[in-house]
């Protein structure tokens, strides 16, 4: 398992083809219509439209903006607006603050608001919930858990020897946890007046916390932690024999309604929402691309 993860994390820029990422099929996500095909990226000026989304997807979004704008990741980062959670991102689209949004699936209430405005979503990629086990440097922390093992670590007064720390309330990773496990994290251990649902994960021996795979690629893995395999699979593993990492989640693209087809926002939306755009994005977010961003390697708190 360590060898598989190492292979994913050490693929160089000249080997961006090593390993594959699942490319989801285009869907309407509860609304009619889908992004028209524009298989070849057409250069757009990032000053001519507003693009953003939730903070957890900033790696994917900034890479896409850099590609379409024919500019550097850093320049795209300065232009795009990736902050907050997905509900806030979808609201910014409704309010007209953003022309194009990249975010995780909205709540049922938000989905209804989007549909009422004629906004449909196009599935453009997959992310995953990743669990990190804290340990001492000298310990061997190669772990392979089941989903039930993870839930046990988050139960009050469990005897597993592990204490689960959840992400902040309202964060996308907290919502994804509830989606993939069917309920919110129930941990209630107190630490300096905070419970483990809100306290920053200390990444010490016996602690478990989580983030998203794309956030982990962007920020780096905290020291003295190991990624927990789930059902024998790591998030970077290539699916084989019908087996894949089980804790995955889709993310979506949407554009403000009423724009002309030659509007820069529409050109960008049609490219990224096309088969070619989704295929490119799946390859672009592989670890070598994350290394080229130059973002901080410190992730002191799950997001």
Model-based region annotation:
Residues 1-9:
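Positively charged n-region of N-terminal signal peptides that target proteins for export
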